[in-house]
């Protein structure tokens, strides 16, 4: 059995999990999330602990039990604490402004780039060169952060662009004659 799948998911106070048919619904202080249950995994709710087991002895079911356990664990963490990604803008004149549910980026193009944030995702700019993306769904927070970074990815010679706060960019040396 998968090592990750063996560990139960402990449900904190104030988190409700409902398993109906093939749908898993998690409700908490920061919202509600839903996930479709895989047929290869059986889930049991035992007094505040969710246990995951493969439905059969196949290798795929074993792997999927660990995957489902981690997805549900991320949902529980998301509705209690939430997730956030920090991005930093490096470059002369590069700045960001949060305008409600929109993010306005000035990153060296002839026009500002305006990005709409989907429901459930909040964006903040503590300083003009920092962007903080928060939400309860880990996958969506990471996806939106990747889309913001893709507007102007860091270039390898000077390192200018939008990067994750903890990302290390290796700077290349310029060509010598």
From Swiss-Prot:
Cellular component terms (Gene Ontology): cytosolic large ribosomal subunit
InterPro entries membership: Ribosomal_uL6-like, Ribosomal_uL6-like_a/b-dom_sf, Ribosomal_uL6_a/b-dom, Ribosomal_uL6_bac-type, Ribosomal_uL6_CS
Keywords: Ribonucleoprotein, Ribosomal protein, RNA-binding, rRNA-binding
Source taxon at top rank: Bacteria
SUPFAM superfamilies: Ribosomal protein L6
Biological process terms in GO annotation: cytoplasmic translation
This protein's record includes keyword rRNA-binding: yes
PROSITE patterns according to UniProt: RIBOSOMAL_L6_1
Alphabetized GO MF terms: rRNA binding; structural constituent of ribosome
Signal peptide: none
Similarity remark: Belongs to the universal ribosomal protein uL6 family.
Role of this protein: This protein binds to the 23S rRNA, and is important in its secondary structure. It is located near the subunit interface in the base of the L7/L12 stalk, and near the tRNA binding site of the peptidyltransferase center.
Quaternary state and interactors: Part of the 50S ribosomal subunit.
NCBIfam families, per the entry: L6_bact
Protein name: Large ribosomal subunit protein uL6
Organism annotation: Polaromonas sp. (strain JS666 / ATCC BAA-500)
